[in-house]
């Protein structure tokens, strides 16, 4: 009795210019020939079917025949793209039941643990857009309450198995990942060319900024094209031994992208979800050696050594299970790395380090060298303990810069002009003293409100870092924006609260990479 | 820095014929003058503001100027209605942050208990449509995991306080509620006229069917108008001492309606949420004496005496706290009550009982009398133990029927024709034996697939009940439908699995009302 009602006439597909993000949306007329719209309300779910092809969508109802007539069903942009059938095709539209895997989610809500088969079914339905927003939220929140280690392993395995699975013809495929939160922390763009110049394979995919003023992909985009598909990425890696591309077109762990799109608005952030997200992507990417950077600081994502330890163990446990050698380093996350925050400014810092320019940010150089050193030690041919010296040699000799240029050429020319925002003003110290702290969250927010990362030239250029002595009225940093109203807002906010703590203590020294 | 960006030009409101149900939806152009749509994705949240009036909405983006131009913002039907500003009004549109109360939801997800103030803030935001679907799901699921008794009391109080709060000029205001799940269980339409005929006040609001083939409001609608607003309802109660109206226009506990709209698609159903839903509505309705009917049976909502006990204690606890005298009766929920299932058939049964017609269903009559007896005992002037006799007297004498007629006249004429579906066929016994069980879930589904409650004349008319002897080929029930394809589907499903268990045991006897 739950079979589709095939005796009703099919509707013809029409495309509606509505970008509804992740959610599939279908529109029918209140006088539809194929459905009794009285039984529907807005945001019910319907099933569209052509032969064996099925799409689940959230329903909206219109009274406007110009939008959708009684014989039509309208598909929003993402639904139209995913269903991939031409306008005018005949499609059956029936009420949809929830995906069967939702029973497991309900059990999880009640406190049961899930089997690997149940988790695999959930991830499969997620990745194929069969869950509504609410249903995704239901899964995430039930899992946020508790996730057993067995559940976590099943989740990582299932997430890595849907979507692209890359394999490489060498046993040592290195990768690095930073859990984020630190402005200006663009070490990846220095580490990748060093490691590739040495001869280890490092096929790096990165994200665009989600809540920060720049991601590696946003910054790299100023130097080269980053929206490569899988085949194009493989060509670059085979030619250069490494790449710096955006993960968006490579489709590694698509379920993760979907989960993140709900975690973000709900600000859900549990260790297990972080580990599942990162490890599923690395597993799908074919990485075998992974270095993870945990910045620790009062305004970083990880605020204490205990928290870092727990998270490290979780990464190691999952890595061991899947045959990925995971190494976690805790780094100084008390302040931004480098000087620039925002894509253009960060690209400037990266190229200054790679080019051994005078005035290149020493902390960005030093951190990148230390991370690269860890990765180079994965090379069995390198004598133990010489990774740092080798990294420094590759950077100082210009080999890393040359490799970066090769990667840029292979990926293709950047589509973006690398211009700084035309509005700029300095934010000044309110008193004499020593910089004792820089609030990373605050600096991130200021750079975002100035327009970064959408406005590539917007952001913040730091003149002072922790330990620097400042005089009242001396500039702390410069705010850049490309848009007048964003500039006014960001500057006013920075002047109200700069994010700098200035007093007369001398800050404690912290080792950069543990 | 999170202040609205007032330096951007406002947009003008346009109305879009899209019924998006509970969710507020706003549409802007990808080339919008007031927003940088690049920073948005579909299903981001935006804040619309005119002076101090604010609406939160989920955003969709269009490339079609004919739908929404760069100077416009489109509001879906519910958003337009709720914002209540004319087409063409200038409105500022800015990115919306989540409601502040969502921090408490996040704490709850992490396992914290919430204060009364936090719960009140959540309910206030819910009732004012400030939560997205996902956010509502987040709250429900965090609460489904555990809800303390203090949290439950705070929830009931907060839910009852938003929306209409009815007060009556008498200390004894009786009410009844059935937790549902039993087909044909239309006792309310018999109990209300008996109790009102006696002289106790019983201002009854009922729901339409959500997952069953008929609600009291759907059935009553065949006899009288039910979509009364608060003032009209009060007039009926003052004139008749009781009413039988749909709760939808009375706006008791609007937060409950919103929670239910998410609980339903997720099939969330915890004791605490059931208690919060029912008790908040009764408190808002001004009820002081409440009788709750728990049908217990293998396919009922409550399947065991232990479960019934736990739920009863929870209702009593909340009732005591808010000064509502709650009495719970467990009733026989092993099979449907009466013969008809579906609005027209159920209205027929109700009127047969009220009219003392020969052949009126004895079980529906008996159960209604027993429930009415419990309610009549709330009258201090009635001698203890005489409630049943008094109820029977009011029914047998025709006083209850007369009262029903008075209520019908006061509420106004029914807008619906009371015609049975024109397609009908009998479902036959597959073997000789005795009816040992009737699956309530199955019967509900069959009646729904036949078209009930939307098709008022669709449903099932039972010829056999538990304990009846049947011969192979004898009709068990008749399926009615108004639509050919629904008829075919329902009949095929019924023939595949009738919902009747027939064997050679004699079923155990169960007392009707405990």
Swiss-Prot record, chains A, B:
Catalytic activity: thymidine + phosphate = 2-deoxy-alpha-D-ribose 1-phosphate + thymine
GO cellular component: cytosol
A single GO BP: pyrimidine nucleobase metabolic process
Domain of life according to the entry: Bacteria
GO molecular function, one term: 1,4-alpha-oligoglucan phosphorylase activity
Class in the EC hierarchy, top level: transferase
Annotated keywords: Glycosyltransferase, Transferase
Coiled-coil residue windows: none
EC nos: 2.4.2.4
Pfam families attached to this UniProt entry: Glycos_trans_3N (PF02885), Glycos_transf_3 (PF00591), PYNP_C (PF07831)
Entry's family note: Belongs to the thymidine/pyrimidine-nucleoside phosphorylase family. Type 2 subfamily.
HAMAP family: Thymid_phosp_2
UniProt-recorded name of the protein: Putative thymidine phosphorylase
